[in-house]
Each structure stands twice: as structure tokens, then as C-alpha cells.
């Protein structure tokens, strides 16, 4: 059996209008991960891109970054570091505050999870406004890691999240782009 193409993977992602609020077109990756062949092909595409880049740690953002980051880390022989919301990690953490549409939040990683000069790949399911990625990159930098790239399964270019990554001098890669919102 042939692995699904990138277009077939994209077609597995359901678009849900007016979720979570009216006017939003939600791109639902759960429909992708429910399809074993498409999910496996997605991970394999990421593995092919990163397998020879000497990555020490893959950092995945809560919660959907875990879905793609952990199997990628295992496949390339890297450690996996979860980025979590406040109060979810048991050891001492470092955190970064970031802006939401209505207020602020913070992201945390264990303070000893990333060593100085470790090569780090940031992984998340979606690049939209870039706020979560920006905060995660700042956490990695504060921990001494070198972000070699940020990888996303989906990018929404209209929301200009890539601009925040460019401002931090971090290259990024996205498998699938959904134009518009």
C-alpha cells in the first residue's frame, strides 16, 4: 500500500466553520490523526526532514504539539520536552508570558530539560498568530538551547505567525498551508 500524498493528508483535515466562535474556520487535526495511514505519513515526512540534523531535543507545545513531537523525537533518537501550561510540570520550571486575544497566559518547561547549546526543534500542530511559538522559542533560548527550526503540520499564512518567527531569526517549516482564515 502506498503512503498518502501530502494532498491526501491535507484532505484528511476537516474544516469546521464557526468553531470555537463565529467567524473562525477551525482546522481539525483530530480527523488527521484518526486516519492511521495519514498520521503515519505525516510523522514520516517530518522524520525525513529532520533525521540527519543532529537534533538533541524536540520541544512540543501543549497539547497537540505532543501528538506530533513525541513520535518524531523517538524516530530521530532525540529527547522530547513538553511545553505546558502553569501547574502541569512537577519539577522547577522556567516560564514565558505571552499575549492572548483577551489577556495573558504563560508557558513552562522544566528548568533542566534543555542544556546549553543543545540543538532543538520546536514542533506544534498549527502556526496561526505565532504567539505560542514565540513564547516557546523564548523559553528554549532562555534555557540555552539553539532552535534550529520550528515545524508545523498546518500553517494559516493569513494570520502572519511567520513574522514572529522571522523576528526571532528562527526558520520554520510547515507541511500544509490553508490560505485565508
From Swiss-Prot:
- Indicate whether Glycosyltransferase appears among the record's keywords: yes
Instruction: Answer whether the UniProt record assigns the keyword Manganese to this protein.
Output: no
Q: What is its main location?
A: cytoplasm
Which pathway or pathways does this protein act in?
Answer: Purine metabolism; AMP biosynthesis via salvage pathway; AMP from adenine: step 1/1
Which cellular component terms (GO) are annotated to the entry? Answer: cytosol
PROSITE patterns recorded: PUR_PYR_PR_TRANSFER (PS00103)
What are the recorded GO MF terms, alphabetically? adenine phosphoribosyltransferase activity
Q: Tell me the enzyme class.
A: transferase
Q: Which keywords belong to this entry?
A: Cytoplasm, Glycosyltransferase, Purine salvage, Transferase
E.C. designation(s)? 2.4.2.7
Q: Which GO terms describe its biological process?
A: adenine salvage; AMP salvage; purine ribonucleoside salvage
Q: Which reaction does it catalyse?
A: AMP + diphosphate = 5-phospho-alpha-D-ribose 1-diphosphate + adenine
**Subcellular location field:** Cytoplasm
Q: Where is the signal peptide?
A: none
Q: State the function annotated in the UniProt record.
A: Catalyzes a salvage reaction resulting in the formation of AMP, that is energically less costly than de novo synthesis.
Instruction: Describe the family membership recorded for this protein in Swiss-Prot or TrEMBL.
Output: Belongs to the purine/pyrimidine phosphoribosyltransferase family.
On subunit structure and binding partners, the annotation says: Homodimer.
UniProt-recorded name of the protein: Adenine phosphoribosyltransferase
Species of provenance: Psychromonas ingrahamii (strain DSM 17664 / CCUG 51855 / 37)
Supply the gene name. Answer: apt
Amino acid at each position: 500500500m502506498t503512503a498518502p500524498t501530502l494532498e491526501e493528508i491535507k484532505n484528511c483535515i476537516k474544516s469546521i466553520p464557526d468553531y470555537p466562535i463565529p467567524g473562525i474556520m477551525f482546522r481539525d487535526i483530530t480527523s488527521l490523526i484518526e486516519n492511521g495511514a495519514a498520521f503515519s505519513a505525516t510523522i514520516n515526512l517530518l522524520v525525513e526532514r529532520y533525521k540527519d540534523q543532529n537534533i538533541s531535543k524536540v520541544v512540543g507545545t501543549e497539547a497537540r504539539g505532543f501528538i506530533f513531537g513525541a513520535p518524531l523525537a523517538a524516530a530521530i533518537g532525540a529527547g522530547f520536552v513538553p511545553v505546558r501550561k502553569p501547574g502541569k510540570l512537577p519539577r522547577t520550571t522556567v516560564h514565558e508570558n505571552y499575549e492572548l486575544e483577551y489577556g495573558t497566559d504563560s508557558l513552562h518547561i522544566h528548568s533542566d530539560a534543555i542544556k546549553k547549546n543543545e540543538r532543538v526543534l520546536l514542533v506544534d500542530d498549527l502556526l496561526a498568530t505565532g504567539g505560542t511559538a514565540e513564547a516557546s522559542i523564548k523559553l528554549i533560548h532562555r534555557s540555552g538551547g539553539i532552535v534550529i527550526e520550528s515545524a508545523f503540520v498546518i500553517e494559516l499564512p493569513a494570520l502572519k505567525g511567520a513574522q514572529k518567527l522571522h523576528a526571532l531569526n528562527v526558520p520554520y517549516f510547515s507541511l500544509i498551508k490553508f490560505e485565508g482564515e
